[in-house]
Amino acid sequence: MRTSQYLLSTQKETPADAEVISHQLMLRAGMIRKLASGLYTWLPTGVRVLKKVENIVREEMNNAGAIEVSMPVVQPADLWQESGRWEQYGPELLRFVDRGERPFVLGPTHEEVITDLIRGEINSYKQLPLNFFQIQTKFRDELRPRFGVMRAREFLMKDAYSFHTTQESLQETYDAMYTAYSKIFSRMDLNFRAVLADTGSIGGSASHEFQVLAESGEDDIVFSTGSDYAANIEFAEALAPTEPRAPATEELRIVDTPNAKTIAELVEQFKLPIEKTVKTLLVHAHEESGHKLVALLVRGDHDLNEIKAEKLPQVAKPLTFASEEEIRAAIGAGPGSLGPVNLSLPVIADRSVAVMSDFGAGANIDGKHYFGINWERDLALPLVADLRNVVEGDISPDGKGTLQIKRGIEVGHIFQLGTKYSEAMKATVQGEDGRNQVMTMGCYGIGVSRVVAAAIEQNHDDRGIIWPDAIAPFQVAILPMNMHKSFRVKELAEELYTTLRSHGIDVILDDRKERPGVMFADMELIGVPHNIVIGDRNLDSEEVEYKNRRVGEKQMIKTSEIVEFLLSQIKR
């Protein structure tokens, strides 16, 4: 590719509305342009990277035995009603009607469509297992699209779906997809971790996320110092404290706290250790519990894990916090004065709260708190459950080592769905015994466009992007100095350009009439890994300058050896 025949579209200034570095650099490098909130046009440089990611994903899916299909973005609403997700999915599902008043959705995912397809095509256990994949546009009507293509409304995704008659068969394909995903992200030279995860709205029994480690990540990823345990913080179990509850040393007393409506204010004003305080959070109760609200207790320095809380049978799904109006109607006090003593609601305490003694909490009277609270003296010990997020230093759930926490960007997710969709949609095959059997399913997703942004978050400096070779828009940039004035510079540049292309190398020849500084800045910004500078002075000694974008080192290479040298440097 020649820059004179290419839309480079680089920008010097950082757009004011771009929050994260990947969004800033994708705009400045001319990879994307915003069309509307959460909607982006991909420009040539962006498309080149996107296609590189797609090709790696497609190759490894094929290597793993998956079969490519293509399903419509527009899906009939009746499939979503049949699966039960029409009501469950919420406002992220964009719903519309056609001219015949028939309801449809823009697909955020394709479980319903593939299940509908396979139930009409597969009728015998002898045809299974099968694994189908596509690389397709998805749409989720995000409330607040942000971070560029990281959390866009329209995005490109690889989704795969497998069908089985046994759990053992599903496990084999799940393991094969786990291996394929590891190969995909390794080929892209990404620093990633596969972590245990919650199944979320997709459903199912087992799940792993593939997280690219980056400070800008939205997810907290938990690692053990003593084993290979790794999990999303939403999934990681907080073990019960091993130390028994200390005996009571204080009397229960009620204290006026008119200006302490938060844990932080209580700790500041009364010099109470934060680990001696309890937060009382009221959420809507499950309708079968016979109550409107249920109280959840976590230690003052801990955060409620809403995923864990929502799984409790006493809690309504989706988890919804009580409004101040609902709290006052039920308790007679505001949210800043709630506590477990004399509380006329069902109470569930976190494991760490259950071993506390001499602690403080609201008195269920505005402007008052109880101090010196002790279980089984001042109130009965309630139901106990794991309700909190783990923190650094906690014992690992597998009992080996302690936990560390890092930030991650989710780029892939694999699920063992079981029979959630196939049972709801009556997707059956004839089993070995001649009886109809519901198929067992797995699903496996990769955010293709998100991978591009995640790679930038891991690979950049103050001059621009530093692409890994495998997904760079161009592997080599040829930068001829004053080629329009020097015949021998132009001759070598053209010869090198032709030779590298014949070896299958993606190369860009900067043949613009631009100053060297502009040429260097643009190639650094778009992240070309290998750069060759051809100048008249160096040609006197039959040399060119090679610069590696990642390490920044410059080398003088003989013109007769440059092709062989580049082929040895490029990871292919």
Curated annotation (Swiss-Prot):
Give the Enzyme Commission number. Answer: 6.1.1.15
InterPro entries attached to this UniProt entry = aa-tRNA-synt_IIb, aa-tRNA-synth_II, aa-tRNA-synth_II/BPL/LPL, Anticodon-bd, Anticodon-bd_dom_sf, Pro-tRNA-ligase_IIa, Pro-tRNA-synth_IIa_bac-type, Pro-tRNA-Synthase_IIa_type1
Please name the PROSITE patterns in this protein's record: AA_TRNA_LIGASE_II (PS50862)
Where does it reside? Cytoplasm
Similarity remark? Belongs to the class-II aminoacyl-tRNA synthetase family. ProS type 1 subfamily.
Q: Which organism is it from?
A: Yersinia pseudotuberculosis serotype IB (strain PB1/+)
Mention any one GO cellular component term assigned to this protein in its UniProt record.
cytosol
Q: What is this protein called?
A: Proline--tRNA ligase
